[in-house]
């Protein structure tokens, strides 16, 4: 048995098209033009690529994008002052500060400075808290993108055993909340988890985001499981791989996301959806 591939590129293109149509409809209705402000501090090459991809998605959707590229030497006060200006700007619907920030900056303080209704990354504690109490407002992009993928492929988490490997604030924790919201029975595994292989082997739905190449072995996976690999790692030979051992996993799983082309495109599509949602919040 070879698993069906979950095609994030295909699903993301449909979602981006839907956003583009909604943006065009807003313009016909004389509503203000959705606008995303993206802040990049320093010259990290990977971050520059991510920012460029986000700008390209904005162009596809007809969303206005503002770019702020600040030097590595930018102080905490200067960065917070920029966030304050963007918070106060009624033309700006979404604010995204690209992570990671240079080490001398306090990223948590910066994320908490963004107005929750403009927090299109969904990282503000207010938005994570809303998700926890079943009242989501701005949902973290990668976990929400995973849920969109599951829905697109007819996978209902209700009553299923879902296992999340990795407990980061960006993926693992909010992913567990999203799955809980969908009424799955959720287990979160982390660095202190004992018998990780047993936990993984019990998963009907497995989501892995630890940032370690091929961390989860194919033989651990329950036959017929759905495997969502959030990891993206560059190997010494320049190739990309996920956190799951793909070649062996696809022989046991029923469905699996490839890397690249699985979760990554969904993160950006969800960012566009969140920006559109933020614009609708600001219509009132």
From Swiss-Prot:
Its EC number is 1.5.1.5, 3.5.4.9. NADP(+) binds at residues 166-168, 191, 232. It comes from the Bacteria. Pathway: One-carbon metabolism; tetrahydrofolate interconversion. Keywords: Amino-acid biosynthesis, Histidine biosynthesis, Hydrolase, Methionine biosynthesis, Multifunctional enzyme, NADP, One-carbon metabolism, Oxidoreductase, Purine biosynthesis. GO terms for molecular function: methenyltetrahydrofolate cyclohydrolase activity; methylenetetrahydrofolate dehydrogenase (NADP+) activity. Pfam families: THF_DHG_CYH, THF_DHG_CYH_C. GO terms for cellular component: cytosol. One of its GO terms (biological process) is methionine biosynthetic process. Belongs to the tetrahydrofolate dehydrogenase/cyclohydrolase family. PANTHER family: C-1-TETRAHYDROFOLATE SYNTHASE, CYTOPLASMIC, C-1-TETRAHYDROFOLATE SYNTHASE, CYTOPLASMIC-RELATED. Catalyzes the oxidation of 5,10-methylenetetrahydrofolate to 5,10-methenyltetrahydrofolate and then the hydrolysis of 5,10-methenyltetrahydrofolate to 10-formyltetrahydrofolate. This is Bifunctional protein FolD. The gene is folD.
């Amino acid at each position: 048995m070879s698993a069906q591939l979950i095609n994030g590129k295909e699903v993301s293109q449909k979602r981006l098209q839907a956003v583009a149509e909604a943006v065009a409809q807003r313009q016909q209705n004389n509503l203000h033009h959705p606008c995303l402000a993206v802040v990049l501090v320093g010259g990290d090459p990977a971050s520059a690529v991510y920012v460029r991809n986000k700008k390209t998605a904005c162009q596809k959707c007809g969303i206005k994008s503002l770019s702020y590229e600040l030097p590595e030497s930018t102080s905490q006060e200067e960065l917070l002052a920029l966030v304050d200006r963007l918070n106060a700007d009624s033309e700006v619907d979404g604010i995204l500060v690209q992570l990671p920030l240079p080490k001398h900056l306090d990223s948590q303080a910066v994320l908490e400075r963004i107005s929750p209704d403009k927090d299109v990354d969904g990282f503000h504690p207010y938005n994570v808290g809303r998700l926890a109490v079943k009242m989501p407002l701005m949902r973290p992009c990668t976990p929400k993108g995973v849920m969109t993928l599951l829905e697109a492929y007819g996978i209902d988490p209700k009553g299923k055993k879902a296992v999340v490997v990795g407990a980061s604030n960006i993926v693992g924790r909010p992913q567990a909340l999203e799955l809980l919201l969908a009424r799955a029975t959720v287990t979160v595994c982390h660095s202190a988890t004992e018998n990780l292989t047993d936990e993984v082997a019990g998963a009907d739905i497995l989501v892995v985001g630890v940032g370690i190449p091929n961390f989860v072995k194919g033989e651990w996976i329950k036959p017929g499981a759905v495997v969502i690999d959030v990891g993206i790692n560059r190997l010494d030979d320049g190739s990309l791989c996920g956190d799951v051992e793909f070649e062996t996993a696809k022989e046991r799983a029923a469905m699996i996301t490839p890397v690249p082309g699985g979760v990554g495109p969904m993160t950006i599509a969800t960012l566009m959806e969140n920006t559109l949602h933020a614009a609708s919040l600001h219509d009132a």
